[in-house]
Amino acid sequence: MWTNFFKLRLFCCLLAVLMVVVLVVNVTQVEYLDHETVSATFIDSSGQFVSSQVTGISRNPYCGYDQQTLSSQERMEEDSLLAALHQQVPDVGPVPFVKSTDPSSSYFVILNSAAFFKVGSQLEVLVHVQDFQRKPKKYGGDYLQARIHSPKLQAGAVGRVVDYQNGFYKVFFTLLWPGKVKVSVSLVHPSEGIRVLQRLQEDKPDRVYFKSLFRSGRISETTECNVCLPGNLPLCNFTDLYTGEPWFCFKPKKLPCSSRITHFKGGYLKGLLTAAESAFFQSGVNIKMPINSSGPDWVTVIPRRIKETNNLELSQGSGTFPSGYYYKDQWRPRKFKMRQFNDPDNITECLQRKVVHLFGDSTIRQWFEYLTTFVPDLVEFNLGSPKNVGPFLAVDQKHNILLKYRCHGPPIRFTTVFSNELHYVANELNGIVGGKNTVVAIAVWSRFSTFPLEVYIRRLRNIRRAVVRLLDRSPKTVVVIRTANAQELGPEVSLFNSDWYNFQLDTILRRMFSGVGVYLVDAWEMTLAHYLPHKLHPDEVIVKNQLDMFLSFVCPLET
């Protein structure tokens, strides 16, 4: 009897242990399955957020910018933007280096250069490009930059380039100051190089790659992350639930996706070009090289009479080009009077009782750095944030000024950012009440140059929605957009941050925010028109002019 009872008790114990083991295995499987779930949030035609989930391991390459549901109006807008930019590059097949554009044998001619021009007159320049065999080219697609300038006056303005797709270009300038005015034209990239840049933009969105650190206890793993990940490995999906902005990381082998703690730039892919393609990207040969004039490269401009000057100012419409010009190193917008904030007290008076939000990349972080350096009463609080990353905060308690900076969400090329600090601008805007004492400035462009244009269009679409909502609930909120700017280029930098890429982004930004009710700081023209070398982070004199323009929107001259 006791023997049977002992056997029954042993059997029950074994059964209980077995049930516990099965339960643990099932819980583990459920947790593992949950971390492998690939989910995405899309936007339907009504503008509402629609969430979809696919349970299981993603085995196919996933590019988040392809997974969009757009309204018919959004689709038309995107198609129009892409068509306008893509048609600039002719498809002529492979071209040997000797038949590519040679800036040293190309030339420009000032039309009617012997005539005297008045301030406000149009100046036309004809550019003829030739190859390295000194033969005229029969197609266009070269990326040119042009400006007029008077060094002694520290004056400058940009020109509008028109490509006739036959090897000839025209540059149109508006002469905006009197005196001797010189013309400068540069070849940024030959059309053959532009075709390579376009291929990289479409086929190599991962040429700048990112990583994340995952950690749990003593176990840590690092995996690659991006908007688009190649291969068949399982993914962690970090797509934003509110905006639908896609972001993915390869799943760690041992850790769950929820253990991600940091985001950082991994590096730049090498070996992107063939030997033949590399010839189109040579410093001192065909990257940002001057094109010389055939004949005079300057004209004489005489002042207008006072009555003519008043008529000229009245005739300037909303589509004024250029938007402004430098004179004595001060930017002069053509559509309104810009104030000069030369004294810290002027800035303090303007920003008194205001909350200023700066969102975006490192080019708008320069604004935060300038203000906290120039205005002594703006005291920066140490939030323990990583250098150059943020978030940053400065306060002037006496005058009730609050200044904030926060970087935009991925892709962001900073060294290390805690994953919980990766905030999308659209989400931040949705949390702002707004009002007459609220100022918002946004600069989102420099980290999108390596991606297909659809990625940038999507980001701006989300930001635009949030801006419209903010202005609807608080119409007196001041919203300012800082545009892209030109920068220094070399053979390698051109493949990632070319001015041609940034010109595309700048064009998209201007069109998408046209008519929205925001102010524009034209950093693009303010960089190109200045005599200083181009830099991603412009020198202080240019930043100062940007801030003067920004503050003039916040505190305009009383009329």
UniProtKB/Swiss-Prot annotation:
Glycans are attached at residues 26, 237, 346. It comes from the Eukaryota. The keyword Glycoprotein applies. One of its GO terms (cellular component) is extracellular region. It is found in: Secreted. Residues 1-30 form the signal peptide. Pfam families: Neurexophilin, NXPE4_C. Keywords: Glycoprotein, Secreted, Signal. PANTHER family: NXPE FAMILY MEMBER, NXPE FAMILY MEMBER 3. Belongs to the NXPE family. This is NXPE family member 3. It comes from Pongo abelii (Sumatran orangutan).
